[in-house]
Amino acid sequence: MKIAVLLSGGVDSSYSAYSLKEQGHELVGIYLKLHASEKKHDLYIKNAQKACEFLGIPLEVLDFQKDFKSAVYDEFINAYEEGQTPNPCALCNPLMKFGLALDHALKLGCEKIATGHYARVKEIDKISYIQEALDKTKDQSYFLYALEHEVIAKLVFPLGDLLKKDIKPLALNAMPFLGTLETYKESQEICFVEKSYIDTLKKHVEVEKEGVVKNLQGEVIGTHKGYMQYTIGKRKGFSIKGALEPHFVVGIDAKKNELVVGKKEDLATHSLKAKNKSLMKDFKDGEYFIKARYRSVPAKAHVSLKDEVIEVGFKEPFYGVAKGQALVVYKDDILLGGGVIV
């Protein structure tokens, strides 16, 4: 089978390509220019080229920087301006990697596209679904909720049945040169955030703009440094007059540049809604597990679809729900889709 492999210049994607090559597939390496500086791109492309030369496969470089900026990066900035906590990876996957890059791979005659994501594809009744990775500590299925069946059927995740701790030893044994590659330290969560998301925002908007902090009764009880520096659940970085116990951000008013704070129990919710839904065609209202944050423990809830809006009712209090984050629905370890929390 002819498969396109997205190569980042790192160990995981290189080993993904190696494992597919060992299985006898015909491969085409693809490097995506999305966000980094030209200096970084040059290094990553050099690393990807070394992997391709080792494997005896071609490498194509696709420049999607303009597309990424308008569809992902700018949306990230806009969401924070609106007082939300965005999830850019959940946008990038369907639009860039499994959108534009997949389209290009198909034009090259490839049947599928592979990446170093920690996830799996499982076919149930001849329909393809995303399944959580074997290594639950590294599982990335949360970021793939917006993919449709037809796209999922064209995906390959070679690392899905492996543990993260085993990848590097396996990769270095198979491809010894990987241990000598120069690289840059990247953010663990968002690829284009090098230090903190606040530093990224400062390049484009006024972040440090002092405002007031109110309690749930609407009384002014303190000050903050600028609403974009806070997310729901944060308990530091603002000043409360005479505070004797911890306070948590429970609300953000972007238009007024105000924070609302309360006690930990005030973060609890028993319901939430999500828009821009992307649920599998056979979805039926019922009891499921949901995640409202990456790495959060799945919570049991009743999930229903009403007028294109996902409505969730929790069995137990659920804490720290932030607008803009992805709400993702699972049946056991099978991903059924999700939406954006409103």
Swiss-Prot record:
The record lists ATP as bound by: 6-13, 32, 116
Give the active-site positions.
92, 191
Q: Offer one example of a GO biological process linked to this entry.
A: tRNA wobble position uridine thiolation
Q: Name one GO cellular component term.
A: cytoplasm
Location in or out of the cell? Cytoplasm
Q: Where is the signal peptide?
A: none
MF terms in GO: ATP binding; tRNA binding; tRNA-uridine 2-sulfurtransferase activity
- EC? 2.8.1.13
| Region Interaction with tRNA, residue ranges | 138-140, 293-294
InterPro entries, per the entry: MnmA-like (IPR004506), MnmA-like_C (IPR046885), MnmA-like_central (IPR046884), MnmA-like_central_sf (IPR023382), Rossmann-like_a/b/a_fold (IPR014729)
Q: Which UniProt keywords apply?
A: ATP-binding, Cytoplasm, Disulfide bond, Nucleotide-binding, RNA-binding, Transferase, tRNA processing, tRNA-binding
Q: Which residue positions does UniProt flag as site: Interaction with tRNA?
A: 117, 325
The disulfide bridges present are 92-191
Q: Which reaction does it catalyse?
A: S-sulfanyl-L-cysteinyl-[protein] + uridine(34) in tRNA + AH2 + ATP = 2-thiouridine(34) in tRNA + L-cysteinyl-[protein] + A + AMP + diphosphate + H(+)
Record keyword ATP-binding present: yes
Q: Which HAMAP family match?
A: tRNA_thiouridyl_MnmA (MF_00144)
Functionally, this protein is described as follows: Catalyzes the 2-thiolation of uridine at the wobble position (U34) of tRNA, leading to the formation of s(2)U34.
Q: What is the similarity comment for this entry?
A: Belongs to the MnmA/TRMU family.
What is the protein's given name? tRNA-specific 2-thiouridylase MnmA
